[in-house]
Amino acid sequence: MIKKRKKKSYTSVYALGQYISMSAHKARRVIDQIRGRSYEEALMILELMPYRGCYPIFKLVYSAAANASHNKGFKETNLVISKAEVNQGNTVKKLKPRARGRSYPIKRSTCHITIVLEDISFYQQYEEYLMYLKKPGCRNENRNLTCYDTYSSGGLWDKK
């Protein structure tokens, strides 16, 4: 079996919430509203939506932004939610006691939520660099960047 290695992404940061006691369907309704939005806009949307599932997702988005600013030094104004997914977790099965010694099963569903934030300032800098390279005459100016004095140190290898 061939394993593919993931390339390290220098512009993305994630936060993962596991075993959140909420149905995956209800969490997806909230996640679909914030996917692709900026960080600050997503926080405003999550604060104003009237669903119970907004609070754990709000905490995850906030945690992902804290990871971005602390671990990688990104600014929160440049962050965008690039990927937000909800997966089904384990189902906790309980028994509820009923009359005459009977019991009814209760299924408590959980979900796993992943929030990935990307820094868009990196892409803007990259696009500016590409525009710079497309300008006429800029490639010829940058060709003479090698310093030949570093290669000719006067050692054994310079003798003919």
UniProtKB/Swiss-Prot annotation:
GO (cellular component) term, any one: large ribosomal subunit
Principal location listed in the UniProt entry: plastid
Keyword NADP: no
Ribonucleoprotein as UniProt keyword: yes
Biological process, per Gene Ontology: translation
Key words, A-Z: Chloroplast, Plastid, Ribonucleoprotein, Ribosomal protein, RNA-binding, rRNA-binding
Record Pfam families: Ribosomal_L22
InterPro entries (UniProt xref): Ribosomal_uL22 (IPR001063), Ribosomal_uL22_bac/chlpt-type (IPR005727), Ribosomal_uL22_bac/org-type (IPR047867), Ribosomal_uL22_CS (IPR018260), Ribosomal_uL22_sf (IPR036394)
Compartments (UniProt record): Plastid, Chloroplast
Molecular function in Gene Ontology: rRNA binding; structural constituent of ribosome
CDD domains in alphabetical order: Ribosomal_L22
Subunit structure: Part of the 50S ribosomal subunit.
Family membership: Belongs to the universal ribosomal protein uL22 family.
Protein task: This protein binds specifically to 23S rRNA.
Protein name per Swiss-Prot or TrEMBL: Large ribosomal subunit protein uL22c
Source taxonomy: Eukaryota, Viridiplantae, Streptophyta, Embryophyta, Tracheophyta
